């Protein structure tokens, strides 16, 4: 009985997290649609680190990908996992992903999320913390899914490569569970619908080696 209860509790938790996960991008203010992303010349990585660091250790402050993006990172307010910044030139750290030991970075596809579509396998992703510490990752997967019911947080999703269909909960597990990694998330606009699909870009830690 205890095992079954634990399984049901975990299933309910995963479902709640899944709903939060999709609401974070789907229910964004209409005003965000009027702010079109305008990329500027990116700063050097050294200059970017100086701009975002504030002395706070273990607080994620920025993400940098050469020739693609240089975004300060804002944190979600406590108790508000649906929050996504409406400021152009920013990404938002997804607090729910942190509960899984992973890093989720959210942005509206009308703002900084546009740059997420320029990410490709093999690119280096550098995370900058408040104390200047840098953590490096490599992009390993770019996943694109069509939302079969774009206006519903309960939508099922079709993989645009292969046609696999996933539930909301299965999608959450696919992109946010597992060993430590970074997931970029934004919506895909198609056929005049800003929420037609979802884009996820996954990056794994760069292996480190020591000499004996």
For every predicted segment, state its role.
Residues 31-212:
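Solvent-exposed, non-transmembrane regions of membrane-associated and secreted proteins
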């Amino acid at each position: 009985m205890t095992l079954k209860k634990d399984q049901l509790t975990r299933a309910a938790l995963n479902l709640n997290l899944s709903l939060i996960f999709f609401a974070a991008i789907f229910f964004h203010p209409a005003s965000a649609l009027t702010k079109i992303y305008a990329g500027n010349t990116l700063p050097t990585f050294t200059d970017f680190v100086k701009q975002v660091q504030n002395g706070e250790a273990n607080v994620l402050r920025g993400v940098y990908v050469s020739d693609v993006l240089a975004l300060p990172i804002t944190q979600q307010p406590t108790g508000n996992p649906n929050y996504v910044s409406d400021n152009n030139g920013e990404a938002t750290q997804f607090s729910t992903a942190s509960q899984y030991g992973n890093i989720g970075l959210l942005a509206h596809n009308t703002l900084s999320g546009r740059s997420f579509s320029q990410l490709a396998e093999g690119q280096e992703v550098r995370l900058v913390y408040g104390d200047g510490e840098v953590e490096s990752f490599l992009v390993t997967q770019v996943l694109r899914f069509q939302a079969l019911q774009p206006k519903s947080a309960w939508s099922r999703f079709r993989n645009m490569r292969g046609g696999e269909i996933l539930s909301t909960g299965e999608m959450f597990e696919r992109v946010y569970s597992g060993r430590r990694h970074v997931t970029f998330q934004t919506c895909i606009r198609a056929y005049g619908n800003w929420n037609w699909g979802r884009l996820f870009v996954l990056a794994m830690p760069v292996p480190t080696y020591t000499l004996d």
